[in-house]
Amino acid sequence: IGVPDYRDEVREYLEIAVVGCDLRPGAKAPRLTELIHRAIPYPVILITRDPGGLAISLAHKRWAERQAGRIVIEDVESTGPLTKAVVDQAFIHDLSLAKQPTRSLFTLYQGWITRVQALHAARLSGAYAATDDQAVSDRRRAALDTISRLTREGATLRVKAAKEKQMNRRVDLNLQIQRLEAALVAARKDL
């Protein structure tokens, strides 16, 4: 395809593999996806199919810091099951090689990861908008991380509030939940 390979002190991308995998019903897709990414020593576009539908996952690879010659994966970015929703279809259309940055195999792979992150943002905001602007991508990634963290904290507080017997403590927990919900609204604006 004419895209130069990539080498630096952290990683080496000589090729990108596209791997397909059919998963059995009841398979633990996230764990299997991570294992496949760990097993293959170069960047992989993993397309999995299970009863829920097709999913695409990617994970940057880098040299291990303490073991020479060993490769470790960074965060696995997965689409989850793709549907016929407008944002999912916009994402699929945006995966074309012609729409990716091609300075190196690293930037090409990062372009696809950025599109997966844009899909996550679109599923929350309702509008798919991919960009290769690093500042926008970093802000989106931070907002997605914040939303994920706040959602987990909110779920934990709701469980505590449901179990709480003392009314004043329950009121305090509900106020904390309201503050988290306000922070979630603010974080969604950064998508």
Residue positions per predicted region:
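Short, charge-rich, low-complexity alpha-helical interaction segments
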Residues: 102-144
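N-terminal, leucine/charged-rich tether regions that mediate assembly and partner docking
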Residues: 1-63
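Residue-level marker of positions within ordered structural domains that often coincide
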Residues: 51, 117, 178
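Mid-to-C-terminal oligomerization/interaction "stalk" domains of large proteins
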Residues: 27, 40-41, 86, 136, ...
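Alpha-helical oligomerization segments
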Residues: 133-134, 144-191
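Activity-critical C-terminal alpha-helical subdomain
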Residues: 91-97, 104
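Compact, glycine/acidic-enriched structural inserts
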Residues: 62-91
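Generic detector of well-ordered alpha-helical segments enriched in charged/polar residues
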Residues: 30-33, 37, 106-117, 151
